[in-house]
Each structure stands twice: as structure tokens, then as C-alpha cells.
Amino acid sequence: MYSPDTTKYLIHISLTAEGVVEKPDVVGAIFGQTEGLLGEDLDLRDLQRTGRVGRIDVQIASKKGETSGEILISTSLDRAETAILAASLETIDRVGPCVAHVSVKMVEDIRVSKRKKIVERAKEILVERFDDGTIDSDELLDDVRQTLRVEKIGTIGEEKLPAGPNVLESDAIIIVEGRADVINLLRYGIKNTVAVEGTNIPKSIVELTEKKTTTAFFDGDRGGELILRELLQVADIDFVAFSPRGKSVEDMSKKEVIKTLRNKVPVEYVRDQYFEDSAELPGDLGGRPARTAPAHDEGGNSDTTGKQAVSQKRIRDGTSKVPTTLRDHMDDVKGKNVARFLNQDMVVIRESRSEEVEKAVETLEEPAAGVVVDRTVDQKLLDRLVWKGLEYVAAKDFKGIIKRPLNIRLMKMSS
């Protein structure tokens, strides 16, 4: 039996008959007039029986007393045998009772057609189906460096807390939730990170915060807020930073980590969110000024304390004209009776008078990440800001807040 998968060539034959004939007449003429013509090895019936020649496809039509059309014969013979078979078909001079003229139009190499289809399909697969595996030398170097950094993770204290290699030597530390957070920050060259490993704050953490400038860097979910609440009660925290909404610290990219740490805020700006009375905070934490020191120790170099102190001094003196952090905006807005809507990059997208903030939030032309407003925020205004999808509100004060939404962060400006 002939298999179409073995086809090598397809013979195209044109047929013209001087009269009306039908398909059985054409097939009969082909077998009858070629029988015994080429010997036993190339007999058409034997070739079909052994599966070396396929079925004879006759496509004809009659018009005005004449019949014309095409005959298609597929073969798995070699080139020479196929040529001989095709030539033998041109000897047919009668179909039924009619004079006929038969000629070979072409012999199509099916394998060439298959190759063309393969090439076209390969092009599609190359463009659409392959993952982007482009090798970038910078990415390779980063991967190797990240591996080295991760291998340097160690432990500190009796509790064996996961920590970066520079925690004990650095003037500033970052406190995160777990080991995965330490590893992620270590990948990006931040080596002064230590994990609390749960809500029971270890003694080693408390002792470190008393000696070093400390930034608390937690997930912006309920768990992160609970850890921060306990940490504020037992430890000496200077700055607070939260991961973006919907992301944990361990999943953040390098750009997101650096941006979040750069936009950290002093603990005084967030303590009212967790404590109704600042007396709940330990010692004089509620009233002491925040120490100015680097939030992260990248590449083992912690000599950025002076630079940050100068930067913050310029902000306090009013010599920095373009605020770049949330703290800058809070200091800049204070006492000016204005409201600023900020995007994720801390860029002002809308500014209005503080008493017109309700109208301004309804006419924003682009999404805002938060608002800094020099006025007291009540429950009605807060609900409207939450409905607009804001992530944080920094205000002069908060009054009458009975229902505090979990998906927005409230920060009170220091007086």
C-alpha cells in the first residue's frame, strides 16, 4: 500500500481529448496503453501494488464537445525511474473512443516543497517560540557577583540571626523580617542587613539599635506592621521603610530596593500610626532627633554619613529646591497650606491648596501614589483618598479616624 509520507515526486500531466470522456476512461487508457511497455520492474500496476506509485488523480472537465484537464501521479521512485514513467504516459494517444493528447507539464519535487515549509516554520518558531536567551556580559558578571555575595551571609548573636558580613562593622544597619530578605539585599551589594526572624524581637537586635543608626525595612502587609509595632516598643529605630504594595522585600528588584531605602522616613513621621500616645515608645524615642546616617552599606563602603548629613542639612536650610524624597516633601509642605500628589518616583503630579484637596483628587490626570497635605485629615477625606487608590497619606494631623483602612499608610508630620 502506498504511503503519502514516502512521496518524492509528483508528476503533473495535461490531457486534451477530442470528445467527451470520463475519469474511468482516462484511468483505463493509462493502464491499458502502458502495460508491458517498460518491462516488469516499471509496470504501473506492479508499482502501485508494491506502494512505489500512488493513486492516479484525474481532474477533467468537458466543454463544447472537448475534454481537458490534469492528471496527478505521486511516486517514491528515483529521478530516472520517475522520468521514464512520465515519458511513457506521453505515448497515450486515445482515451475511450476519442483521440487524445498527453504531455508532461512538470515533475514536482515534493521534498523541496517540504523543505520550504520547514524553513518558513523554522523562522516562525525562531521568532515566536524561543525564550529570549541573549547572553549579556554584564548579566553574567552580575550573576557571578551575586553568588559570591549570597555565600557571604552569616549569623550574629546568641540567636544566630541571619546577617550580612558588614553588620557589626557598619555605622548603620537595616532590619528586615527573614533570611530571604537578607539574601535578596545581599545580591544587590547591601551588606549591613540583619533579620529579626519573627515577631519576638531578639536581644541582639535591641543591642545593635542602641549603637547604630537603624532602618526598619519590612513588607507593607499586616505582618510587617506587627513586627514594626513590637520593634518600636523595644528597640531604638531611626528610620522606617516599607516595600511597595503587593511586593515583599525578598521579591523586590535592585531598583525598587534602592528607591525604597532612599525614600525612608524618620520614625517620628510614622509612630502615630502605631501608637495613640508617644509615651508608649521606649525612653525618649518619641522626642529625640533622628540620627543622619546611611541606610545601606553597599560594596562594603559605609563612608557616606557625611554626605547624607550635608544633604539633610540643605533640606532643612531650604537650599534644596527640588524635593526627591517623601521626607523632603513633608518638610517642604509644612506650614504652606498646600497639598501635593506624588507618583511612585516622588515627582509632583498635582499641587493645590490644602482645603481644595477633595476637588483635586477627583481631577487627577494620572494615578497618584500618595499625597502630602498641610491640614488635618478626617474620616471622610481619608475614605475618598482610599477609594482613589492612594498608598499613603502624610498630613498635619489625623482626627476622628474611626475606621483605619489596612491598605493605606498614615504618616503624621512632626511639629
Swiss-Prot record:
Enzyme kind, highest EC tier: transferase
Catalytic activity: ssDNA + n NTP = ssDNA/pppN(pN)n-1 hybrid + (n-1) diphosphate
UniProt EC number: 2.7.7.101
Cofactor(s), by name: Mg(2+)
Signal peptide start and end residues: none
Biased composition (Polar residues): 301-311
Record carries keyword Transferase: yes
InterPro entries: DnaG_primase (IPR050219), Primase_DnaG_arc (IPR020607), TOPRIM_DnaG/twinkle (IPR034154), TOPRIM_dom (IPR006171)
Lipoprotein is among the record's keywords: no
Entry-linked PANTHER family: DNA PRIMASE
HAMAP family in alphabetical order: DNA_primase_DnaG_arc
Family: Belongs to the archaeal DnaG primase family.
Functional summary from the UniProt entry: RNA polymerase that catalyzes the synthesis of short RNA molecules used as primers for DNA polymerase during DNA replication.
Quaternary organization: Forms a ternary complex with MCM helicase and DNA.
Protein name: DNA primase DnaG
Organism, scientific name: Methanoregula boonei (strain DSM 21154 / JCM 14090 / 6A8)
The gene coding this protein: dnaG
